[in-house]
Design a protein with these regions (language model features):
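Structured beta-strand/loop patches that form or line metal/cofactor-binding pockets in enzymes
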Residues: 42-73
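N-terminal cap/recognition module
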Residues: 71-112
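Glycine/serine-rich phosphate-binding loop and adjoining beta1-alpha1 elements at the start
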Residues: 96, 115-229
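Rossmann-like adenosine-cofactor binding region
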Residues: 264-363, 368
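Conserved active-site and cofactor/substrate-binding residues in soluble primary-metabolism enzymes
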Residues: 3, 17, 21-24, 28, ...
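Glycine-rich phosphate/diphosphate-binding loop of Rossmann-like nucleotide-binding domains
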Residues: 193-196, 201-312
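Adenosine-phosphate binding glycine-rich loop
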Residues: 2-25, 220, 332-444
Length: 444
């Protein structure tokens, strides 16, 4: 690490003690774009990078709600409004016991770059609560969402900050949140994305992140003169993202051999069929967080408490949680002939895994590869603004084009001789657009 980068990171860590995920995200970005930053006197003189790592606003609030026993419960709510240089703050709400301010700052920082790459006018933000939806009744979740939105509604709006769903926040929660916003503000506007189609949602939104990451992988392969059809693929997870990726992979003729859950992973040597992909929805609807029943139903092998990165594959898609793929996993994949790792979950790979993969095979960072979800959220915002609804085919075509544009940006800024450094390309491409906007608006 360069001395100047170390000095920058030491200063950041001193101001943000204990926020390790945020530090990891910032360091990965800075190491790839430091030379670009130093080469531009305008950025350096006005400390654009120093400003970029500080959120414009952090909102923290208590969320009191009443459980089914009539007892008062208290949770903590957050909204990190990170950067609005290129558009309204945009990013999901996460309801999970692991939610912390540092984790949300990491996600909001990443979101700023990801949204910039989509070419759509969206800034970066993230929010949520340490509330756990698991084990709660629909009425308890509704009362919590209503209390959460009663406070959050003071700080968001269709042209200010447009949250979406994330872990623990699906269509049910978005509906409760939107209903409360509408009651309080007495207006029907596109203040949230991920809504049901009946009240302003977009087609293709549930599968968008998964579809988008496969489109991105297609473009990566096309850059090498290859196609995705016939490739053996391993993915982790079985939620919305993994399901969307699985659906598109099967449609395009790839051989998908794994899905996984907290209980372990299944290996289907023949490859998942459309029936198997559809069964993923049943598994998720059961709320049991297990994939073992797939093995029983389809005659696949189940490996308890193991990760799918030990199987032979051409492409790996980590689709579950952050830091799920470590350096040892990356080494196993490379040793087994894996050609590409396409990071589909947010920061799905550890910093060590990214460095190892980038040095040995082709690696696509999440801020580029998983931008399909927020891209279709942006398209939902556009449809809400126009009071119009596009067909599934129209949305899918726009998503495919956006992922191509993101890939082209990564190639433009990440070309290193005969190789493309997608991490570098995504970071520089996302940074320059935001930095130029900040300078033009007098942020510097």
């Amino acid at each position: 690490m360069k001395a100047e980068i170390k000095e920058f990171m030491d200063a950041l860590k001193a101001r943000t003690v204990g926020e390790s995920e945020f530090h990891q995200a910032v360091q990965e970005v800075i190491e790839t774009l430091w030379d670009t930053y130093q080469a531009n006197p305008k950025y350096k003189a006005n400390k654009i990078l120093e400003k970029m790592v500080e959120p414009e606003r952090v909102i923290m609030f208590r969320v009191p709600w009443i459980d089914d026993k009539g007892e008062v419960q208290i949770n903590r709510g957050y909204r990190v409004q990170f950067n609005s240089a290129i558009g309204p703050y945009k990013g999901g709400l996460r309801f999970h016991p692991s939610v912390t301010l540092g984790g949300l700052k990491f996600l909001g920082f990443e979101q700023t770059f990801k949204n910039s790459l989509t070419t759509l006018p969206m800034g970066g933000g993230k929010g949520g609560s340490d509330f756990n939806t698991k084990g709660k009744s629909d009425n308890e979740i509704m009362r919590f969402c209503q209390s959460f939105m009663t406070e959050l509604c003071k700080y968001i709006g269709a042209d200010t900050d447009v949250p979406a769903g994330d872990i623990g926040v699906g269509g049910r929660e978005i509906g409760f949140l939107f209903g409360q916003y509408k009651r309080i503000r007495n207006e029907f506007v596109g203040v949230l994305t991920g809504k049901n189609r009946e009240f302003g949602g977009s087609r293709v939104r549930p599968e968008a992140t998964g579809y988008g990451t496969v489109y991105f992988a297609q473009h990566m392969l096309a850059e090498k003169g290859e196609k995705i059809a016939g490739k053996t693929v391993a993915i982790s997870g079985f939620g919305n993202v993994a399901w969307g990726a699985a659906q598109k992979l099967v449609q395009l003729g790839a051989k998908l051999v794994t899905i996984s859950g907290p209980d372990g992973y299944i290996y289907d040597e023949k490859g998942l069929t459309q029936e198997g992909v559809d069964y993923m929805l049943e598994l998720r609807a059961s709320n049991n967080d297990v994939v073992a029943p797939y093995a029983e139903k389809f005659g696949a092998k189940f490996f308890p408490k193991a990760k799918p990165w030990e199987v032979k594959c051409d492409i790996a898609f980590p689709c579950a949680i952050q830091n799920e793929l470590n350096e040892d996993d990356a080494k196993k994949l490379v040793a087994n002939g894996c050609q590409m790792i396409v990071e589909t979950s947010n920061m799905g790979c550890t910093a060590e895994a990214v460095n190892y993969a980038n040095a040995h095979i082709t690696f696509a960072p999440g801020k580029a590869a998983n931008a399909g979800g927020v891209a279709v959220s942006g398209l939902e915002m556009s449809q809400n603004s126009m009071r119009y609804s596009w067909t599934a085919e129209e949305v899918d075509a726009k998503l495919s084009q956006i992922m191509k544009d993101i890939h082209d940006t990564c190639v433009k800024f990440g070309k290193e001789g005969n190789k493309i450094n997608y991490v570098k390309g995504a970071n520089i491409g996302g940074f320059i657009k935001v930095a130029e906007a900040m300078c033009a608006q007098g942020h510097c």
